[in-house]
Amino acid sequence: MMNMLLVSLGAVAGAILRWQLAVWFNPFLTQFAFGTLFVNLCGCFLIGITLGVNLQDAQKLLFVTGFLGSFTTFSSFSAEVSQFILSEKYWRGLAVISAHLIGGLVLTILGILVAKFWVSGRFY
């Protein structure tokens, strides 16, 4: 029961923050859902940090499964790319895919390195 509560609390916070960031960021670029990219890249950086530190099981449930699970959004990313492809805006779709995948990998690695440096004072 406690595990479900931890996941639920994290999920509520993550979903509300994702929604609010989309409301703030998406109007800036009307032809690109910047809010989705922003939350996914932030989520990648944050999960990288969690990989670089030792979290207890309860912390993982709250933050990784709950918060990051609802904060990041693969389904919105997929929907946005699909809309570009179906409207024959292939280059925009490819740009969104590239930004999410390359940016996500780079920020996950950066998060790991930052956490390792924070914990041990070294990047390895």
Curated annotation (Swiss-Prot):
RNA-binding keyword on record: no
Membrane topology term: Multi-pass membrane protein
Activity regulation info: Na(+) is not transported, but it plays an essential structural role and its presence is essential for fluoride channel function.
Gene Ontology biological process: cellular detoxification of fluoride
Binding-site list for Na(+): G69, T72
Gene Ontology molecular function terms on file: fluoride channel activity; metal ion binding
Transmembrane residue ranges: 5-25, 32-52, 61-81, 94-114
One family name in Pfam for this protein: CRCB
A cellular component annotation (GO) from this entry: plasma membrane
Source species, domain of life: Bacteria
Main location: membrane
Protein purpose: Fluoride-specific ion channel. Important for reducing fluoride concentration in the cell, thus reducing its toxicity.
HAMAP family from the UniProt entry: FluC
Protein family: Belongs to the fluoride channel Fluc/FEX (TC 1.A.43) family.
Designated name of the protein: Fluoride-specific ion channel FluC
